[in-house]
């Protein structure tokens, strides 16, 4: 499960490491029986698909480039994902694990007991046929029984034990998960903050932040941790994914990049940003990040 290395029979396959899609599967009803189908036979839930405007790295208003080296790529439909996990105390059965062209992680389709269907990010260890549940802040505060601490269940940070691995974490209550949603990512609950109503969480970057205890989080690590091993192998596959060629700064004009211009080929300078001349290897700390106290 995860990735496979292609035989080096051509230049495009020499270094290619691609997904094997072994985790893709779905329960399909055929007559009176439920049959498990695999890989390319798994089709998405049509009621949860929608057309998505593809900006291709450009502004909607002026059309100028806002994200370089993007554009083209295969046509794709957006899968509507439930990042809020706001359906409280209704059990849901995992019916499928599917590919999502808009993200590195896999997604899984849930069939709730009341008939509703939703997609969520696929956590590592969750299998087709398993049952998951979430609980809202209001129900948890009212003393209703909490779901089990296992992959796929969701609850407010206040009720998640210290040391638990989590993903799909909200920054603001009710806004939906924004942290740790990519393949293989995770965060960890460290404990209560000295500031009332906040929980200390170690981010995927290693930074420790205070997040409000009412914010929802999902138990477990995002699946497909092998994503970091993927090598597309050739430029054409990168174009299928919507990536355009990266132009070197030394090949540009002086108006376009600090490394541009000069007579003939030039050696370049120390790495600089095309916009403000800052060094590329420095990381600016977030000015608006929440200060924390570990004392």
Swiss-Prot record:
Cellular component aspect of the GO annotation: large ribosomal subunit
GO MF: rRNA binding; structural constituent of ribosome; transferase activity
InterPro entries: NA-bd_OB-fold, Rib_uL2_dom2, Ribosomal_uL2, Ribosomal_uL2_bac/org-type, Ribosomal_uL2_C, Ribosomal_uL2_CS, Ribosomal_uL2_dom3, Ribosomal_uL2_RNA-bd_dom
Positions of region (Disordered): 243-295
Matches recorded under Gene3D superfamilies: 2.30.30.30, Nucleic acid-binding proteins, Ribosomal protein L2, domain 3
A Gene Ontology BP annotation from the UniProt entry: cytoplasmic translation
Regions of compositional bias (Basic and acidic residues) in chain numbering: 256-287
Transcription regulation recorded as keyword: no
Alphabetical UniProt keywords: Ribonucleoprotein, Ribosomal protein, RNA-binding, rRNA-binding
Role noted for this protein: One of the primary rRNA binding proteins. Required for association of the 30S and 50S subunits to form the 70S ribosome, for tRNA binding and peptide bond formation. It has been suggested to have peptidyltransferase activity; this is somewhat controversial. Makes several contacts with the 16S rRNA in the 70S ribosome.
Xref: NCBIfam families: rplB_bact (TIGR01171)
HAMAP family: Ribosomal_uL2_B
Assembly description: Part of the 50S ribosomal subunit. Forms a bridge to the 30S subunit in the 70S ribosome.
Family the UniProt entry places it in: Belongs to the universal ribosomal protein uL2 family.
UniProt-recorded name of the protein: Large ribosomal subunit protein uL2
Organism: Aquifex pyrophilus
């Amino acid at each position: 499960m995860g990735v496979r290395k292609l035989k080096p029979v051509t230049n495009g396959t020499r270094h290619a490491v691609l997904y094997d899609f072994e985790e893709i599967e779905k329960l399909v009803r055929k007559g009176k029986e439920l049959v498990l189908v695999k890989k390319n036979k798994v089709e998405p839930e049509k009621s949860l698909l929608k057309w998505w405007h593809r900006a291709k790295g450009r502004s909607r208003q002026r059309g100028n480039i806002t994200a370089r080296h993007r554009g083209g790529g295969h046509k794709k439909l957006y899968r509507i994902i439930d990042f809020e996990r706001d359906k409280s105390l209704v059990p849901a059965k995992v019916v499928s694990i599917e590919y999502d062209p808009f993200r590195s992680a896999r997604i899984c389709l849930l069939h709730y007991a009341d008939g509703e269907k939703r997609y969520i990010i696929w956590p590592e260890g969750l299998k087709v046929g398993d049952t998951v549940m979430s609980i809202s802040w209001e129900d948890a505060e009212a003393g209703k029984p909490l779901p089990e601490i296992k992959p796929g269940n969701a609850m407010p940070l206040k009720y998640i034990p210290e040391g638990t691995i989590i993903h799909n974490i909200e920054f603001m209550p009710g806004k939906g998960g924004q942290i740790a949603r990519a393949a293989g990512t995770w965060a960890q609950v460290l404990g209560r903050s000295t500031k009332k109503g906040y929980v200390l969480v170690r981010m995927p970057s290693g930074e420790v932040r205070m997040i409000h205890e009412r914010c929802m989080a999902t138990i477990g690590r995002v699946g497909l941790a092998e994503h970091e091993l993927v090598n597309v192998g050739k430029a054409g596959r990168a174009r299928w994914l919507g990536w355009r060629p990266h132009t070197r700064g030394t090949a540009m004009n002086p108006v376009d990049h600090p490394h541009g211009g000069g007579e003939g080929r030039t050696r370049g300078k120390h790495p600089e940003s095309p916009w403000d001349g800052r060094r590329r290897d420095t990381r600016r700390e977030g000015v608006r990040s929440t200060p924390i106290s570990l004392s």
